[in-house]
Amino acid sequence: ICIINNDVEVTKDWLKPIKERLNNYPNSIIQPKILDLNNANYFEYAGAAGGFIDKYGYPYCRGRIFDTIEKDNNQYADNEIFWSSGACMFLSKKIFIDLGGFDKTFFAHMEEIDFCWRAFNHGYSIYYISSSKVYHQGAATIKLNSSKTYLNYRNSLFMLTKNLPLKSLVNTIIIRLIMDILSSFRFLIRGEVSNFLSIYKAHLDYYINVKKLLSNRNNYINKPNYFKINSIVYKYFILGKKKFFHL
């Protein structure tokens, strides 16, 4: 099956390399190259050339880290990734059903990352195919608002609690709390009071629901090797590493 947003435009023969990969590796989840419909030479914010997360659940992509979006120079080859964008994702119906689909409690934002993390824990592979290309209207054109900020921060905490190895959960959540407090003051300094408050609303909602989240953790193995770098926040904001190949 293909999960695709209604603001995605496909290209000629885009399905051929996807079908070849699925025929050879039916237990794969696949993402094509996602470019910006409004700026066709650049990657698109939501997915780019495939996604990853750091130790604390902050997402980033090959071709896009935070607000730095790279020009597409075919610099990212076919490779295994950690998460596929929900803007365009291919997988078998069996995988989608076996994993229970997207988590409805997320409502919107980060549900595809949670889904791919569950797939990773179950032993499925997520793969990027550069020769399949689509264009997405996308997230970069949507101004950040307090609702989106709330859902992004809340759902990230939900996702961590569902998928982290239990032994590292408490320490990771504590560090995330500290990092999110620092992030909230960044909004406050810029005068974005509603976004500032949304982070605390997200944490409040998380703590209200944490017991339920813990009781609903699945019985599969929660793998510890889900991240490649400890902190994308530190790499990007402190060390100034703005592009994936700098990491």
Regions found by a protein language model. Name each.
Residues 76, 82-133:
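A short, conserved alpha-helix in the catalytic core of glycosyltransferases
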Residues 55-61, 66-91, 113-115, 140-144, ...:
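A recurrent flexible, glycine/aromatic-enriched loop bordering the glycosyltransferase active site
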Residues 125-227, 231:
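Active-site-adjacent helix/loop segment of glycosyltransferases
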Residues 8-58:
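Conserved donor NDP-sugar-binding/catalytic core segment of glycosyltransferases
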Residues 1-9:
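Short beta-strand-to-loop acidic/aromatic patch adjacent to the donor-nucleotide binding site
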Residues 3, 29-37, 62, 129, ...:
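Short glycine/serine/threonine-enriched helix-capping/active-site loop
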Residues 68-81, 214-247:
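Glycine-rich phosphate/pyrophosphate-binding loop
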